[in-house]
Amino acid sequence: MSTSICPCGSGNLLDACCGHYHAGHPAPCATALMRSRYSAYVLGLVDYLVATTLPAQQAGLDRHAIGAWSAQSTWLGLEVESSEVFGGQPEHAFVTFTARWHDSTGEHSHREQSSFVQNDGRWYFIDPTVEVKVGRNDACLCGSGQKFKKCCSSYL
């Protein structure tokens, strides 16, 4: 059992916090998933970052670039500003946060409102940088069975 503090900023032990999700347990909400993804960047867990991205987008991720950015950065902290959950099936959410890090070019901060979708009991990050080929009347990328225009289109 790890005695290290979780990098997400909760103050809890890693194993009792994000490490639980890194080990395969589903995050109970979008905020927990977002925090666990930040921790995964800190810890270099590229497989986890890919696995928690919307499955239809996973092939478009640059695993090498993710790993390099993770390894070349000193992570300075995470601040979750807000979380907004929208009902419906599937459930969607926005999480607004600021992440800070230092790399060879200096100190940086990034503020973002990320989109998430829950499907089959798991939350997924919807990556706005990964282009997807889907028509408005096609089945949604998240696997809900709904048309894309009625489901995730407004979150991309």
Curated annotation (Swiss-Prot):
Pfam families given in the database record: SEC-C, YchJ_M-like
Organism listed in the record: Pseudomonas fluorescens (strain SBW25)
Domain of life: Bacteria
Protein name, per record: UPF0225 protein PFLU_1319
Family, as annotated: Belongs to the UPF0225 family.
Coiled coil: none
NCBIfam families cross-referenced by the UniProt entry: PRK00183.1 (NF001213), PRK01617.1 (NF002449), PRK01752.1 (NF002486)
Intrachain S-S bonds: none
